[in-house]
Structures are given as C-alpha cells and as structure tokens.
Design a protein with these regions (language model features):
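TPR/TPR-like (Sel1-like) alpha-helical repeat modules
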Residues: 145-170
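Single-residue signature of alpha-solenoid repeat helices
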Residues: 59-65, 110, 150, 157
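N-terminal leader/linker segments that initiate helical-solenoid repeat arrays
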Residues: 27-71
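Classical Sec-dependent N-terminal signal peptides that target proteins to the secretory pathway
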Residues: 1-29
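Short helix-capping/linker turns of helical repeat alpha-solenoids
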Residues: 82-83, 87, 121-123
Length: 186
C-alpha cells in the first residue's frame, strides 16, 4: 500500500511538471529558435528579418525593409545564399516579397522572386502562384492565337502545378483534371 501511494504521488508530480513545462513552452508569444551564425552578418540579419515576415504589418517602413533585404540578397548572389546555414529562411524573403510587392513590381519581377524562393526552398505555395501566373498568360496567348506562347505557358502551368500537387500532397480531382489537360504541353 505504501509503495502504491509513492508511485501515485510520483505520477502526479510527473504529470504536474509536464503540464507546467508545456504550458510554459506554448505560452511564449514568439518562441525563437536561435539561428546558426555564419561568416556573413548581413545574411544573419536577413534571416532574423525573415522570421518576422509572417506577421508583416504592411507599413511603409516594412515595405522599405523588405525591398532592402531583397536587394541585399540579390547583391550576394544565389551561390552565397545557398552556402548560408539558414538558406531556406532567405528563400522566405523572396517568397514574401513576391506576395507583398505584387502591386508594386511588374509580373516578370514577381516571377523572378518566386523562382528565387523555389531555388532556396521547396515550397508548394510558390509553385501554385507561378502556375496561376502562367495560366493567366496562357489564357491571353490563346485569345491572341499565339501558338508559340500558348505552348510555352502551357508547359509552365503543367510544370509548376505538378510540383504544387506533389509537394502539397493534394490529391484533388480538380487538379488532376487540370494537369491532365496541360500534360499535352509537357
């Protein structure tokens, strides 16, 4: 009986401690996991900035910072970016740049930003966005009866939508039907 009481007490203490630990862990406003520092302090700062992008406040200052970091990444070159230990976070800057600066930049610049994001990280939403952009271009080419552009854009729609379906594991019949239609362009 005494042994059973000690075990019961220990289980209660263990449960209480784990409850406190998980409560403390999940009550943090922003749980920041430290980045692995590199030789390039500017890129480390860019990684820190990328962690704030999911709560982008759309102020003029935020847009200016985003543009400045995109220019910084462009000046470093893709080879240097890929050497950084947190290079996928650098891809976030390109991805969010494409999303938030869509009204400011021309479509070709948005495409370039999404492609750079994909070069640094495999992410389904950028593939989907590119598929939509190329689908719109495809529709315009069909209306203008430009067969060369139709084939070019049809191929791109298939490529990016297929990557989206694979990465997102989306098994929707809608996407299968669209992929089947554009498969003739691959």
């Amino acid at each position: 009986m005494i042994y059973g009481g000690k075990m019961k007490r220990n289980l209660i203490i263990l449960f209480f401690n784990s409850f406190l630990f998980f409560n403390l862990l999940y009550s943090q406003e922003s749980l920041n996991i430290p980045i692995t520092p590199s030789d390039d302090q500017q890129l480390d700062n860019a990684v820190g900035f990328s962690r704030t992008l999911n709560s982008f406040n759309k102020s003029a200052n935020s847009y200016a910072k985003l543009k400045a970091y995109i220019n910084l990444l462009d000046s470093k070159g893709m080879k240097a970016l890929k050497k950084h230990p947190s290079y996928s976070r650098l891809g976030d800057i390109y991805m969010y740049g494409a999303m938030y600066l869509e009204k400011e930049y021309k479509e070709n610049k948005i495409i370039e930003l999404y492609k750079k994001a994909l070069e640094l990280r495999a992410e389904p939403n950028s593939n989907y966005s590119l598929a939509i952009i190329y689908k719109n271009r495809y529709d315009i080419a069909v209306k203008k009866k430009d067969a060369v552009k139709e084939v070019e854009y049809g191929k791109m729609v298939y490529e990016y939508l297929n990557k989206y379906v694979i990465l997102s594991r989306n098994k929707s019949a809608k996407y299968k039907k669209i992929l089947n239609y554009f498969s003739s362009y691959k």
